Amino acid sequence: MSIVVKNNIHWVGQRDWEVRDFHGTEYKTLRGSSYNSYLIREEKNVLIDTVDHKFSREFVQNLRNEIDLADIDYIVINHAEEDHAGALTELMAQIPDTPIYCTANAIDSINGHHHHPEWNFNVVKTGDTLDIGNGKQLIFVETPMLHWPDSMMTYLTGDAVLFSNDAFGQHYCDEHLFNDEVDQTELFEQCQRYYANILTPFSRLVTPKITEILGFNLPVDMIATSHGVVWRDNPTQIVELYLKWAADYQEDRITIFYDTMSNNTRMMADAIAQGIAETDPRVAVDRLSTRLQDAGFEMSLSLKAKWRPDQDALELCREHGREIARQWALAPLPQSTVNTVVKEETSATTTADLGPRMQCSVCQWIYDPAKGEPMQDVAPGTPWSEVPDNFLCPECSLGKDVFDELASEAK
């Protein structure tokens, strides 16, 4: 199977729907991944990279269906890790004399993985070119530590396609190949996760290397990555994002770290989060546990204990959250929250006007209509009668039917 990328460029890679761990177990690939290999058919036929070693046989068989292997004139290896060059041994067994173009560091890596120093290696450096006929050339650009010492990119003149290696990719498997064909929200979330996990340690190298590449003043109509989608619609948008992420990027976001045995500390953390959101609604508050589980961390079983914060303690937590939001704001706060007195003024609508507070009969958690439950999108000022039927007690996760009117407020 192959997919036309542009003109005489075909994708001949492999989709991996089932992979869930990458680089050990530290990077969870919940949407799988792909290993992108490209076949360029001009006067000279060029293969850009292979696929992961576990797909070696399928890859070579698929390639054989596209072209007589003996007609492959050059192999370009942008990166020597097994998810890029893993099928080399299987392929070179069929065409052992085919020239391989790569960096000097890549030769060491390839020999370390495949143990064939007799292969026909050709070292390339930044600015070196390879004529492939029909007026087209490959231009090589070394990109050490983005993200490996042997890394490089390859640019195809005429078609203006940049084969970018690991840069600008995502571990994102989809039946579609191009960026304009997939869900944009999910795509950019996966791009950011990929940058955070693969390239963040090398951020200080990203900006100068991208600047160097842009300095060649080469048009870029497409960016063909080693993993994930090919960027054909506004391809430089991902380049602009990389420059942004590399420049000490931070969002107006606060993460609350907490651990809890019986959900009491969680109640306090939620109250702090409520205070933050009251003061600066633009700030996103993430619960770390879900992110850690997404990253592959295991959570231990909890141990129940007695201590629970009362309403006064929770209000102290909310005020603490408000103060955090005021001190850490990256931009001027919305006018409606500048004066924290507004919080008290808006509570001119008294609890009595909103109806009684409700108490969970199982865990004793109290729903206060004046405060709502922002973590379930129940806004402050929502009477119990208007709370959605799918509401769950934040502490014991039981439904509305276990709630009774607070005894002290019962008529």
UniProtKB/Swiss-Prot annotation:
Transmembrane segments: none annotated. The keyword Heme does not apply. Residues 30-210 are annotated as: Zinc metallo-hydrolase. Fe cation 3 binds at C360, C363, C393, C396. InterPro entries: Anaer_NO_rdtase_flvorubredoxin, Flavoprotein-like_sf, Metallo-B-lactamas, ODP_dom, RibonucZ/Hydroxyglut_hydro, Rubredoxin-like_dom, Rubredoxin_dom. Residues 355-406 form the Rubredoxin-like domain. One of its GO terms (cellular component) is cytoplasm. SMART domains: Lactamase_B. PANTHER family: ANAEROBIC NITRIC OXIDE REDUCTASE FLAVORUBREDOXIN. This is Anaerobic nitric oxide reductase flavorubredoxin homolog. The lineage of its organism: Bacteria, Pseudomonadati, Pseudomonadota, Gammaproteobacteria, Enterobacterales.
